[in-house]
Amino acid sequence: MSKRIQAKHKLDRRLGQNIWGRPKSPVNRREYGPGQHGQRRKGKLSDFGTQLRAKQKLKGYYANITEKQFRRYYAEAIRLRGDSGENLVGLLERRLDAVVYRSKFVATPFAARQFVNHGHIRVNGQRVNIPSYLVKPGDVIEVKESSKQLEIVVVASQLAERDVPDYIEADHGKMTARFTRVPTLSEVPYPVHMEPNQVIEFYSR
């Protein structure tokens, strides 16, 4: 088992939730945390503990982005008008790797980050290899012609479920997608309940 897979399993067990909705998640078999003390009875979380867990869950879901990046999203979310929690989710869903994943060009958020890093994606006709690049409404994302037959893409194309959220218009025949608008929290198809306002409270302490 690779270190990355082990890290995913460890986070799932620590949180007690299958945050990526993976069939092989260890929490599908056991609900206690990792390590020798994982089976101890869990007490009620403090406000800080609840906020920390919400942060770990949301940050981990997006291929475990760095703390530095996540703090930048928080700073931008509170600067923007409107609900800061909604703003935070909107910023995360605008990440290029998130849009690639939501478009179902690849099977997982981690695969999407790698796919973008390796230069397989164009935005409005221009090659972009930065996973954190923020897509704007109206932007068109496409898989490079030479990358369409890669195994990672072919495997995703064979998935039975290729549901794409309403804020993305995807053409899987052409391997293109248009980001139509910034979504609200209720529109984002998270496998588990996310609490972005708890994340805002965590950083506001």
Curated annotation (Swiss-Prot):
Coiled-coil regions listed: none
Ribosomal protein in keyword set: yes
Record family assignment: Belongs to the universal ribosomal protein uS4 family.
Keywords on record: Ribonucleoprotein, Ribosomal protein, RNA-binding, rRNA-binding
Residues covered by the S4 RNA-binding domain: 94-156
Location of the region described as Disordered in the Swiss-Prot/TrEMBL record: 15-48
Superkingdom: Bacteria
Protein's name in the database: Small ribosomal subunit protein uS4
Gene name per UniProt: rpsD
Native species: Methylobacterium sp. (strain 4-46)
CDD domains: S4 (cd00165)
HAMAP family per the UniProt record, alphabetical: Ribosomal_uS4_B
Family matches, as SMART domains: Ribosomal_S4, S4
This protein's GO CC annotations: small ribosomal subunit
